[in-house]
């Protein structure tokens, strides 16, 4: 069952990073955002483009986490936390993350 969560979480992360002027990968590489253990990204830089990206990515993640939580009868915070732990663990060396 956990593999199912992780697959859905991975899909949420992928879809939430598509079709942005600044992509999530670009923002991470530039040190503009970082993953957090709570499953959401946090801004490192405070410019308008970065803040918009953070807002959009986190909104998309919230929707996907809620879908996973609803379909598995668990709390959204638990889904987000599992995703956050995975995303931080998978972050390439040099990427920013917050505890």
Language model feature labels by segment:
Residues 14-18:
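N-terminal signal peptide c-region/cleavage motif recognized by signal peptidases
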Residues 9-11, 31:
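Short N-terminal leader segment in a subset of presequences, especially plant chloroplast
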